[in-house]
Amino acid sequence: MNREALRLYLVTNRYQDSVESFLAKVETACRSGVTIVQLREKNLTTNQYYQLAKQVKEITDAYQVPLIIDDRLDVCLAVDAAGLHIGDDELPVSVARKVLGPEKILGVTAKTVKRALEAEKSGADYLGTGAIFPTTTKENAPITLISTLKTICQTVAIPVVAIGGLTSENIDQLMGTGIAGVAVVRDLMQAEDIEAKTQAFLKKLHNILS
């Protein structure tokens, strides 16, 4: 897939926001330059997830930003999202690819070189690797060394996105790893000024990814 689309990857978390406030944040982020959005809301019923996905897709479509659905293949297909992201404990990559078909984007979490190679072989379009730094989004997530991230980038032909505790202040440490982009949750979703924070990320990424 196009590496540029993965440059600044927003992963959502509603925290305590109302639906209206949450959607406003997503809209601001899309307007300000995020290049892809993943809807990741673990605590919703299927219908709640579906309804929220429809609303988010209206926003992402308006800004021509791809929408990725986390975990839920059914919701991805129901709203005709651009793609699906699956983790270690979810559908086998080959099964997800078979159901999605060749046109949808398929992202896969890969914390090791072995998993990265397996995912690539089974049809993944990109990999999400981390947590690079400690994160409150997944409090017990094991840390992936930056050296491991770099090795994964060098080993696979598909793009790799770093994730986990990433902020506009610490992403400089990813210079030279070969990543296609960074996935950000808290530092964007809870920013006081999402537009300014998005621009800060994009400015840093211009140097890191060039």
Swiss-Prot record:
Transmembrane regions listed in the UniProt entry: none
SUPFAM superfamilies: Thiamin phosphate synthase
Residues the entry annotates as binding Mg(2+): D71, E90
Pathway it works in: Cofactor biosynthesis; thiamine diphosphate biosynthesis; thiamine phosphate from 4-amino-2-methyl-5-diphosphomethylpyrimidine and 4-methyl-5-(2-phosphoethyl)-thiazole: step 1/1
InterPro entries recorded: Aldolase_TIM, ThiamineP_synth_sf, ThiamineP_synth_TenI, TMP_synthase
Keyword terms of this UniProt record: Magnesium, Metal-binding, Thiamine biosynthesis, Transferase
Catalytic activity: 2-[(2R,5Z)-2-carboxy-4-methylthiazol-5(2H)-ylidene]ethyl phosphate + 4-amino-2-methyl-5-(diphosphooxymethyl)pyrimidine + 2 H(+) = thiamine phosphate + CO2 + diphosphate; 2-(2-carboxy-4-methylthiazol-5-yl)ethyl phosphate + 4-amino-2-methyl-5-(diphosphooxymethyl)pyrimidine + 2 H(+) = thiamine phosphate + CO2 + diphosphate; 4-methyl-5-(2-phosphooxyethyl)-thiazole + 4-amino-2-methyl-5-(diphosphooxymethyl)pyrimidine + H(+) = thiamine phosphate + diphosphate
Coiled-coil annotated residue ranges, if any: none
Lineage top rank: taxon: Bacteria
EC id: 2.5.1.3
GO cellular component labels: cytoplasm
CDD domains for the chain: TMP_TenI
Cofactor, how bound (note): Binds 1 Mg(2+) ion per subunit.
Residues binding 2-[(2R,5Z)-2-carboxy-4-methylthiazol-5(2H)-ylidene]ethyl phosphate, per UniProt: T135, T136, T137, G165
A Gene Ontology BP annotation from the UniProt entry: thiamine biosynthetic process
UniProt: 4-amino-2-methyl-5-(diphosphooxymethyl)pyrimidine binding residues: Q38, L39, R40, E41, K42, D70, T109, K138
Family listed: Belongs to the thiamine-phosphate synthase family.
Biological function: Condenses 4-methyl-5-(beta-hydroxyethyl)thiazole monophosphate (THZ-P) and 2-methyl-4-amino-5-hydroxymethyl pyrimidine pyrophosphate (HMP-PP) to form thiamine monophosphate (TMP).
PANTHER family according to UniProt: THIAMINE-PHOSPHATE PYROPHOSPHORYLASE, THIAMINE-PHOSPHATE SYNTHASE
Protein name: Thiamine-phosphate synthase 2
Native species: Streptococcus pneumoniae serotype 4 (strain ATCC BAA-334 / TIGR4)
Taxonomic lineage from the root: Bacteria, Bacillati, Bacillota, Bacilli, Lactobacillales
